[in-house]
Amino acid sequence: MTDVKKSIRAGRGTELECLGWEQEAVLRMLRNNLDPEVAEKPEDLIVYGGIGKAARNWDAFHAIERSLKMLKDDETLLIQSGKPVGLFRTHSRAPRVLLANSVLVPKWADWEHFHDLEKKGLMMYGQMTAGSWIYIGSQGILQGTYETFAELARQHFGGSLKGTLTLTAGLGGMGGAQPLSVTMNDGVVIAVEADETRIDKRIETNYCDRKTASIDEALRWAEAARQAGEPLSIGLLGNAAEVHHELLNRGVHIDIVTDQTSAHDPLIGYIPAGYSLEEADRLRRDQPELYVRLSKQSMKKHVEAMLAFKKKGAVVFDYGNNIRQAAKDEGLADAFDFPGFVPAYIRPLFCEGKGPFRWAALSGDPEDIYRTDALLKELFPENQALHRWIDMAQKKVTFQGLPSRICWLGYGEREKMGLAINELVRNGELKAPIVIGRDHLDCGSVASPNRETEAMKDGSDAVGDWAVLNALINTASGASWVSFHHGGGVGMGYSLHAGMVAVADGSILAEQRLSRVLTSDPGMGIIRHADAGYEKAAQVAEEQDIMIPMKKER
């Protein structure tokens, strides 16, 4: 597999392998997901998030490549859990690819049934952006994580994390954004990770500053930085279920506690306490049922430590990996006594249609991204928080794979930025087209009662219709590719979510697509929250002339 691993890299420049730029964009982003700079285990087709994959197997991957190369401008390719299953003639304004990943009928929507289907070669776990081919490395979640810690700082620490110590765990593709997000907010963070290669990857990409296997050394570094008021991120090799209790026993003062281990998947994603990686691999292979049982017991112990830190005065929140649910299932009655990050810090942004707008340069030239950075500042001169974010990103973010950028934009802003990017492609200021997409974690694209839709005002946490409607409206609006997934972030049975990507190739057709998609997509977030009774969302809908047939009187 080593040769395959080395060979997967997105094309650059303006030479096409496909029959059009939309198809070429899909091919490049598929390959970009498996670039060794981007993916966690490219040799196994794993992009991030435990077993979040880009394709079901290598035969399916190569069949997708072949299909994309022959796909015409009026055809649509269908992907079922990472496998190409059909190609139909549609029309030029339809999506070029439609994807459904790991979607199970509700009664059967659990890990046991999923793994049974996976063993038979019938299904693949797509996570969120792994199976939808728009993952851009840890930067993809970076601004959302940064904004979460920034809001936490505003609520609890006077607007800055300077002089505070954060304790977290998990430095995979998503969790890897945590160290840099904390230091961008001037704080100190110890991030516990059981896999040393993951710590090394975050250090190589400048997301984490230092690593150690010694708790004593980590605490010395952290205290020195905290006392000096300097930001510092430390990757600590260890198991959170053990390390956290050791810190409690020592009476270490922690200001903030969260977690981004892959607790959503107790078999593949989480390492039980007391096991090395090698021992865990053997146990997983030989006794998977015992492994899951031990893994869940460790998660309970992990959450018990988080609750103990809360009792000692720390600000504690769940970062969307469903670890509270696992602990509750193991008998921990108060597992949900600390909130999830969305109701605590992010939902007000969702009510404005704000969410993770991202784009990647198909040219492969970083200068194309820097030009779009400048464009963003030109379009939104009054948004100083956005300017600060772009300045920090330019200084601190290392591109992984194709150069890309992430920023949170709201309703109206996304369309404005998308159309302006398309114009830069049209007039030749950019060397090649740009792909514009987002995380599935967005204002109107997810149903996830333990994460994005936790504690909705009207109790509609588990209503899955909204995620389906998001996929449908993006398809009707003509996104270049649209995806619908199950289980991302929080695991089987706990989420439904949709994604979209649109290609800015400078054409009039692209302009029309972008205008429709980048309006209706964030608009879904506004109508979803307005329907749930959020005053801010209803206000934005009224201000923006968004038609809601049965809008509630304000």
Swiss-Prot record:
Keyword Calcium found: no
Enzyme class: lyase
UniProt catalytic activity: 4-imidazolone-5-propanoate = trans-urocanate + H2O
Cofactors named for this entry: NAD(+)
EC number: 4.2.1.49
Any one Gene Ontology cellular component term annotated for this protein: cytoplasm
Superkingdom of this protein's organism: Bacteria
Localisation: Cytoplasm
GO biological process, any: L-histidine catabolic process to glutamate and formate
A Pfam short name: Urocanase
Gene Ontology molecular function: any one: urocanate hydratase activity
Cofactor note: Binds 1 NAD(+) per subunit.
The entry's keywords: Cytoplasm, Histidine metabolism, Lyase, NAD
Entries under Gene3D superfamilies matching the protein: Urocanase like domains (3.40.50.10730), Urocanase superfamily (3.40.1770.10)
Active site (catalytic residues): 407
Function: Catalyzes the conversion of urocanate to 4-imidazolone-5-propionate.
Protein name (Swiss-Prot/TrEMBL): Urocanate hydratase
Gene name of the encoded protein: hutU
